[in-house]
Structure formats: C-alpha cells, structure tokens
Regions:
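Phosphate-group recognition and catalysis centered on beta-loop-alpha active-site segments
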Residues: 28-274
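Bacterial Sec-dependent N-terminal signal peptides
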Residues: 1-33
Length: 274
C-alpha cells in the first residue's frame, strides 16, 4: 500500500511542474497589435458615433465635450453646438447598454478593455465637476476594471489630479515631466506628432526624429504608461511606422481601414502595463 503522505508529496510536485510549464507557455506566447490598440479620433464625427468603433473592437474612443446650460454637449467647436449632441446619450448610455448585455464587460470578449477619452473644451474645473456628477449615475461603468475614463484637453493642474475620484484618469503630455504621484493618476501620455517630426515626401520619418520619439516612448513605457500620437498621417505606411515606434494607441479617423489593416497584418505588441 502506498503511503498517503508520499502520494500527497507527489501531487504537490506535479502541481508545481504544471505551474512552471504553464508559465513557460504564457511566456512564449506572442501578443499582437489588434483593434484594441486602435483609437477612434473625434469619434462623434463618424457616421454612427460610438458604434462604428465599437463594432470593430476599438480599445479607445474619443469624445469632445462642452459644458453648455448645465448640459454636456459633444462637439468639436462652438459652431457644432447647434447639433445638440448629448454626451450622455451618444456615449454613456451606449457603453452602459453594452455592459449590461455582456455581464459587466464592455465586449463579449471578456479580455477586452475600453478607454473613453474625454476631451474637455470648456473650463476644466466646472466641466469636470458636471462630468463626475453625470458619471456617478452609471455605477457599473465607473466601477469597472475593463473601463477607463481618461480626461484630456482642458485639464486641471497635475498637482490636483489626486483630488478627483479614483474612476477619473488623466491623459498626460508625452514631453512633460511628472512627479510619481501625478503619474499614478495618468493613464496615457499623448502628444502632437508634428512636435517631433515632419513626414517626408518618401513616406518615412527622419532617423534623428525616430530616435527622439523612441526615447520618449521608452521612458513612458518604463513608467508603465501607454502612448498615443495625434496629428500623425493616417494611412497604412504611417500606421506601420507608428507601430515600429511602439506607439500603443494608433490614432485614426478611418475606422474600417485601420481595423482591416490590423486584422490582416501581424505586428508583435509588448504591453507597458496599466
């Protein structure tokens, strides 16, 4: 008869070996750029706001908001305010419906995350205060590890980032230094591509500009923060070069084209962390 204590030890050994093998398999698996790395720039200008990007599985969607008569209106500039597009209706209610449909997840694929980038066009303090009151009406949305609410545009002083609720994150500026406390509330670092480089006629980024960009992006990744470059060229060759630079979110106005590009090309992706 086999000693029970011996059997127990054997089980523990096999369990440990299994864990090691599982870890090795995970370590050997490559992750690739997908539409979770795609950002729908000025999404409200799409033919069907929110849903066009969502249906392609985009990981980040952008809405610009104005505070007008105690309401949050989606618009690019004051001329568009006459369209009276409600931020609540276009984005919060649609995201909430997806969460309810998918058991608390934004997507049916439960590993997928969604970032809502909110570009504040009016006074940062007053608009953020109104936004927080509105967001608190959607508890499933704000208390969700798969959803990130990130503030860009007119932002409060970084020293006050920690004064805001935990469900509010901020978009930092890639070229700007931040303290560790400030970085702890920054979800993404963005910048204007043209601050770093001008696209050459042959469709390439100058080598000296590449090194400058790589250095900035590497520093952000060391801090565990993802990067987005806006105002960059928006076509296949440009996307490929942004990916080579390890930009995490590819900014686009062309949702279907970028989705197809990422689905038919396999570029290895290394996540910086949060």
């Amino acid at each position: 008869m086999i000693n029970p204590e011996y059997l127990s030890r054997i089980k523990h050994v096999f369990f440990f070996i299994s864990l090691c093998l599982f870890a090795l398999v995970l370590h050997g698996q490559k992750i690739y750029y997908t539409t979770e790395n795609a950002h729908s720039h000025n999404d409200y200008e799409q033919k069907i706001p929110y849903w066009m990007a969502y249906d392609q599985g985009f990981g980040s969607i952008e809405a610009d908001i104005f505070l007008r008569d105690s309401e949050l209106i989606v618009a690019h500039d004051e001329k568009e305010l006459e369209f009276n597009r409600s931020f609540r209706t276009l984005y919060l209610e649609n995201i909430d419906s997806c969460l309810n449909k998918n058991g608390g997840n934004p997507y049916k694929n439960t590993t997928r995350n969604l970032q809502l980038l909110i570009d504040i066009k009016t006074d940062s303090i007053a608009t953020l205060a109104k936004l927080i009151v509105l967001l608190e009406q959607f508890p499933v949305l704000i208390h969700n590890r798969h959803i990130s609410i990130v503030i860009t545009g007119n932002r409060p002083n970084p020293d006050s980032f920690s004064h805001y609720p935990d469900f509010i994150w901020f978009d930092g500026v890639l070229s700007r230094p931040y303290t560790p406390d400030q970085l702890s509330r920054i979800k993404m670092l963005s910048d204007d591509f043209k601050h770093y480089s001008q696209w050459l006629v042959d469709g390439q980024i100058p080598i000296e500009d590449i090194e400058k960009l790589k250095s900035r992006i590497a520093k952000a990744h060391q801090d565990g923060i993802r990067v987005r470059l806006w105002n960059a060229p928006d076509f296949n060759n440009a996307w490929a070069q942004l990916i080579k630079l390890r930009v995490d979110y590819i900014n686009t106005d062309h949702i279907a084209a970028l989705a197809q590009y990422l689905q038919t090309n396999h570029f290895e992706y290394i996540s910086p962390g949060r």
